[in-house]
Amino acid sequence: MAGQKRHYLITGAAGLVGPALAERLLEDPDNIVFLTDLIKPSIPPGAKHPENVRLLEADLCDQSAMEKVVAAALPLTAAFVFHGIMSGASEANPALAMKVNVDGVRSMLLHLAKVQRGVRVIFSSSNAVYGAPLPEVVTEATTPTPTGVYGCCKYMMEILVNDLNRRGELDAYSVRFPTIVVRPGKPSPAASAFLSGVIREPMNGIECPLPLTDRQFKATLCSPRVAIENLVRITNWPSDKLPPHQRAINFPGIIASVQDLLDALAKVGGEDKLALVKDEPNAAYEAILRSWAWSLDYSKPLELGLIGDENAEGLVREYVATLKK
């Protein structure tokens, strides 16, 4: 006898994380996955049960459209609120960022609480909530002081998630992603996009511009595989895993410099690939990048059962393996 069907809604599903998460969820024939974005998403090519995918094209900033998407997916096992304007585009257009990343997300969270009180929600936040003045090492106990529009929007929604969870309106967690490397596909309008591009583009015979010349610039990174595994784990966490009014958790990442990535590229892909990496300084992007925290202590999320990658070389090898499929 077939099991009871579980419904999962993923917004921002035309990006990287949404399709990868959907593919993982679709390993189970009892999972029905609803994918929605401004542009109609595609069925993940590796989906084991593609018949269980529902594709919904919608502008979630339109209240009526958003409500129709939610209604189609009810009753929900979990909703993954992943839609938003990325860091570089947010800084270039703060009004749009506020409309999408704050107003649109807020409306959806409140509507989910209204139509299915206590539903599990996973909100995608970011390490960009941290900004100057930064301590030597950042933990969940560090007070976020975002110095960019993107981080500001994410932190505002984290606070709303905290309060909705505290009041029992949602059963929610906010996950602060490190930079996911290597992202497949085309470059995104994120300031950190080059951290994937520096591997992805040369491995595909394309030049990659670097927005800063400092090869020792460090960032916190994780692979798509680890990000998806941690999403699945946190989706199944009990409600009391974190205090009711403190629902944000940092997803584990590794600390790697630009040089670490270049060294891994040369080792895995060949020294000739380095010639495709070009310095093209971008002061606006560099300012955003240098405002973010990179030295984070991940002992708490690891103790709670999340996982991390080993090193930069592992990130590159994982991506190269996908090119051979």
Q: Which residue stretches match the model-derived regions?
A:
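N-terminal Rossmann NAD(P)H-binding glycine-rich loop of SDR-like oxidoreductase domains
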Residues: 7-28
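Glycine-rich NAD(P)-binding loop of the Rossmann-fold in SDR/ketoreductase-type enzymes
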Residues: 61, 92, 96-107, 144, ...
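Conserved Rossmann-fold NAD(P)-dependent oxidoreductase catalytic core, especially the SDR/UDP-sugar
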Residues: 79-81, 106-148
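Active-site Tyr-X1-5-Lys
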Residues: 132-134, 145-173
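NAD(P)-dependent short-chain dehydrogenase/reductase
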Residues: 162-218, 224-229
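Mid/C-terminal beta-alpha module of Rossmann-like enzyme folds, strongest
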Residues: 202, 230-285, 289
